Amino acid sequence: MGKKDKRWVLQRKNDHYYNLAKKRNYRSRATYKLFQLNEKFNLIKERNVVVDLGCAPGGWLQAARDIVGDKGFIVGIDLQTVKPLPYENVIAIKGDMTKEEILKQARDLLPEKPDVIICDASPNISGVWDVDHARSLELTTMALMTATKMLKKGGNFVVKVFQGDLFEKYVQLVSEYFDKAFTTKPRASRDESAEVYVIGKRFNGRKFDMNSKSPIVKLLDTNPKENEITSPSLRKDISKEDSGLMIKRIKEMRSKKE
């Protein structure tokens, strides 16, 4: 075992939330992030209907189930297969959240439009800061777009975003669809992490505007034949061309800001 591996193992042993999650049979330390976000912003209530985008390995599904109880309902969507949880009111679908057929599956399972949409998904990390920032924005913008398609009016939204020079533009975009937009970093987030959570309270019912002047929307690629969004962030085989295009877009937006 190398020095980095030993350091990682030691860090996990000393990680309060990792140990707490393991002790209480939660699948991820991130479970406590949702608990803390909900405590602060009152996003999810008992009996609510919730959709979890990018739900693997299931930590946020567990947290949401603890909050809504046995009278609520939760559907998760992820590209990976998620091991089923022992609750009749928690179902995970394997698929791409940007595909209409997957959203239809989710809608068919739900008893009504969701009260809350949550997303703790992370893009595939390249190690190149501009690319990872762009991928994060792309993924979180698609989560926002999905929320505007599914949420009931007055519903809530929470999504993880990596900080970067276009972060505030994303917050502004969220505020176009919700009465209030907030940013926060829960105690369970590691200090060294670049993650921040964006909260949208009370969905105003607007449809997502693909013609928006927001620079964030320009990170998305529309497939004109299928009228769907194509997402390099959701593919493990992301190409050098995709990465280069993202860097180019980020640099163009940065130069416009200046």
Swiss-Prot record:
Keywords: Cytoplasm, Methyltransferase, rRNA processing, S-adenosyl-L-methionine, Transferase. This is Ribosomal RNA large subunit methyltransferase E. Transmembrane segments: none annotated. Specifically methylates the uridine in position 2552 of 23S rRNA at the 2'-O position of the ribose in the fully assembled 50S ribosomal subunit. Gene3D superfamilies: Vaccinia Virus protein VP39. It catalyses: uridine(2552) in 23S rRNA + S-adenosyl-L-methionine = 2'-O-methyluridine(2552) in 23S rRNA + S-adenosyl-L-homocysteine + H(+). The active site is at 160 (proton acceptor). GO terms for molecular function: rRNA (uridine-2'-O-)-methyltransferase activity. The keyword Cytoplasm applies. InterPro entries: RNA_methyltr_RlmE (IPR050082), RNA_MeTrfase_FtsJ_dom (IPR002877), rRNA-MeTfrase_E (IPR015507), SAM-dependent_MTases_sf (IPR029063). Its EC number is 2.1.1.166. One of its GO terms (cellular component) is cytoplasm. It comes from Methanococcus maripaludis (strain C5 / ATCC BAA-1333). Belongs to the class I-like SAM-binding methyltransferase superfamily. RNA methyltransferase RlmE family. It is found in: Cytoplasm. It is an enzyme of class 2 (transferase). S-adenosyl-L-methionine binds at residues 58, 60, 78, 96, 120.
